[in-house]
Every structure is written in structure tokens, then in C-alpha cells.
Amino acid sequence: MEKPLVFLDTDVLISYLRGDLASVHLFDREILDRVCLAINAIVLQELLFLAEVRNHPEIVDRIQEKVTILDFDLVKLDQYWQNARDIRNILVHSNDVLILSSAANCDYLVTYDKKLKKASSYLYNSKPMVVTPEELLAQLESKV
């Protein structure tokens, strides 16, 4: 059985760096054996601008060892911009639309961002399921 593809938003990586238990648990070996974590270049860029990372650049290497870097889905991106004005009205930053385009074919988008979750409800497919780290861990636990 193929592992679920799990896209991590920047806020989840920030909570990981700050030691929040649910986000830290996502990087535990037992979870990594069950899912494939992913980010895109936008999330990586946002991560590089954090003070914690500037002071300790080796953190990025540790994260990159555990995630897959996804490309942008340009077809999805074009659909979102053309057909989903509601998304543009909800999201403050165009980076979020780029994040949605990369996460479009993932099974889960893990975020604490309520606006991103609301914007994803305007998408035309059932993927990804937008959850918090706690919700993802609970779902994985229920599938054991």
C-alpha cells in the first residue's frame, strides 16, 4: 500500500521548530514510516527567512532529509486563479495559492491556517484533506 502524501504548511514547520508536540511527532520515525511528508519551494523559502533557521541553518538540512520537495502544479494553479475568485478574496498572500497548487494532489494538507483551510473548500476536488497536526495524528492512530 502506498503511503499517504502529506503536505506541511510553513506554520506547522514553525511549530515543529518551537517544539510543539504534535508537529514534532510528525517527524517521529513511526510516523515517517507511515506517511511521506512534503513541502514546496515557497514553504522552504519562508522557512529560510525565520530567525531560528538563520541562526542555525543546519535545521533546514534536517528537515529536507525528511521531506519531499514538490513542484508547483501549474495546471491547478491556473485553474485556481481563473475559476476561484473566492480563493483570492480569502487568502492574503499569493504564496498560499502556490502552496495549494503543490498540495493539490496530496492526501493531506497540514496547517493551522484557518484561511487556507477555508480557501481549500472552494477547490474542485476532494484532495487534499486539510487538517491540523493533531487531527492528522488522530486519523493515523485510528487506522492502526
Locations of regions flagged by a protein language model:
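PIN/NYN-family metal-dependent endoribonuclease catalytic core
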Residues: 8, 24-54, 69-72
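Metal-dependent nucleic-acid phosphoesterase active-site entry motif
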Residues: 1-22, 39
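Acidic, PIN/NYN-like endoribonuclease modules and their adjacent C-terminal/linker elements
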Residues: 1-3, 110, 114-144
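A generic structural signal for short hydrophobic patches within well-formed alpha-helices
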Residues: 13-14, 44-47, 116-117, 136-137
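Short acidic-hydrophobic, aromatic-tinged amphipathic segments that line or gate anion-handling sites
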Residues: 69-75, 129-133
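Active-site neighborhoods of divalent-metal-dependent phosphate/nucleic-acid chemistry enzymes
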Residues: 71-122
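Short, flexible loop segments at the rims of nucleotide/cofactor-binding pockets, characterized by
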Residues: 13-18, 48, 85-92
